[in-house]
Amino acid sequence: QPDRGLAVVWTMREEQLLPAGVMPPSVRGARFCKAERRKECLCGAMVIPGREPFGYAITGDTVVFQDSGGTVRPCLKQIAKEQSWREPGLGIFLYDVWELLTSDDLKQLSELERRITKLENTVLSGVSGAFHQNLMAVRRKVMVYVRYYAQMADMIYKFLENGNGYFSQEDLRLFQLFRERIGRLGEEAQNLREHCLQVWELFQAELDLRQNRIMKVLTIVTTVFMPLTLLVGWYGMNFHNMPELSWEHGYLAMILVSGLTVFLTIWLLKKKKLW
């Protein structure tokens, strides 16, 4: 009640709201933040990550919350306890509610960033474990915040349009400040999304590098022992006109030839820096 210098909050039952015709839309099954301009009010819903959704309806001097999950109630109690407005009004009230609802968002985003950095260090240390599942879980949470801030920005834009004429220029200035705050949080969420993508690409690069190392080892082993396979296949034919088969030192000679072949092959690979 700006004319009397008062800001009053009532807790009312649903049936008490019906006669006034100021009833928020049902939030049952609500999946995103929205604002709708109707003839008699500005109404919509807010779906905040990790909290129960709630609905709201605004007329010229009244704000009604449908808050069965208890999301807004702590904010109203804190405002009643701590805030002392020089000029109580609709805009400053909504601004303070939104500020309190998003006060922990930066902390939540910082925690997600910490988890992403931890996964990145896990990749660099070569310990993958359940990396894929953990990264996908973090990415899903990041995407929830990305969509949430985009929806909030659209919702605040509806308030800035002021189609019902409920808000003063000072109210619109506060709404614009909050929209800029939401924009910064949205940019932070987008940065986390890109960080997730970079960590995934790093994981794929490390995976490809490991596979290349394995293929390199297999190629070297095949190259080293291919001549020995040729010797084994050659002398395994046991032709009678092979003098080495009946030679007294034939077995020892084959061992020496095989060892010399392996040594020369390894030396050649190292000289060519292939190993």
Regions inferred by a protein language model and the residue ranges of each:
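Conserved catalytic-core motifs characterized by acidic clusters
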Residues: 166, 171, 236
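Peripheral, non-transmembrane regulatory/ligand-interaction domains of membrane transport proteins
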Residues: 1-161, 167-168, 177, 181-184, ...
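Hydrophobic alpha-helical transmembrane segments and their immediately adjacent juxtamembrane loops
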Residues: 183-275
